[in-house]
Amino acid sequence: MRSLIVAATLVATTLASAIVATPARAQQNEDNSFKWSGDIQSGHRLYAHNLNGSIKVEAGTGSKLDVTARKHWRRGNPEDVKIVVTQVGTNKGDVVVCALWKGQNSCDEDGYHGRKDNDNGWWGDKNDVSIEITIKVPAGVNIEASSVNGSVDVDGATAEVIAKSVNG
């Protein structure tokens, strides 16, 4: 009888600690943010691509390009989405910022490449992760930004801007 009570107490304690730990883990996951900072000179170009979520480009200071991104979701897996920043072009002077969903091979100045994964990628019914990207751009940097399912806002640009959105 005593071992039954001890076992029941152990099970109850384990369940209680699991219930208490779950909100803390979920809260930590919801802060899935990304930060990157690097140099970009006037006359070079920023390329930003997002499939599901907004892109906001703002005037920055100095010669630093600052990228922040935050993942939002209800039922999807945020680990299936990663933010990638690459420096390309002459002397690696241009910068490409992409949100890559599982099942995509790559992204460059021209956008996304590779096959989509209908079961697990953004297109599937299992992943509702959206990415909110904010980029601070120095004066004189050309901007090319596109989102499939989200807004593209550019404020304070002092060079050429190409902004596209399919549904946003």
Locate predicted features:
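Positively charged n-region of N-terminal signal peptides that target proteins for export
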Residues: 1-7
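Bacterial N-terminal signal peptides
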Residues: 7-18
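Acidic (Asp/Glu) and glycine-rich low-complexity loops/linkers
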Residues: 22-49, 54-146, 153-158, 162-164
